[in-house]
Amino acid sequence: KQIFIALCCFILLFVISLAGCGKGNTKNLVIDYGTSSIYTKDDMDEAIDVIKKQFSSFEGCELHSLSYTSDDACNNEDNIAWMNELEEANDNKESFTQCISFDSSFRSPKNGGGAWNANEEYTWSWWMARSEGGTWKLMTWGY
């Protein structure tokens, strides 16, 4: 019985030690906030946190940079309408009044796997939306 308990403890410690392995790495992230007359640094940081949370599921990838696109690219009627169309397509009811976009570069895992080519640099865009005073919701990301 003692051997069984010791073995269970060893397995538990091993699993706990691996819990952080393989997740998307954002430690060396460089952020370019650009210039905005619409969003504060805090607004952008809240959006960046949403991106980082999603990126953490990109096993073995390393996020290198995030760059705010621009006020013109983000907060225009066409893109806000697009965000609302995406929301409706997902059967959700929130009505967005603001959107924000960041371009990114990141490296895929050295050995590739899944949808990733091995050790390749990717450049993706990340689009989020919110209603006035609300929290950012990640709507779409990719090429």
Which residues does each PLM region occupy?
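Sec-dependent N-terminal signal peptides of Gram-positive bacterial secreted proteins and lipoproteins
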Residues: 2-23
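Flexible low-complexity loop/turn motifs enriched in small/helix-breaking residues
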Residues: 20-120
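Residue-level signal for the start and early helices of compact helical domains
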Residues: 7-12, 93, 97, 119, ...
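Short beta-strand edge/turn micro-motifs at domain boundaries
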Residues: 121-143
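Generic hydrophobic secondary-structure signal
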Residues: 5, 18, 55, 100-102, ...
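Short acidic, gly/pro-rich beta-turn/loop elements at beta-sheet edges
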Residues: 16, 112-114, 138
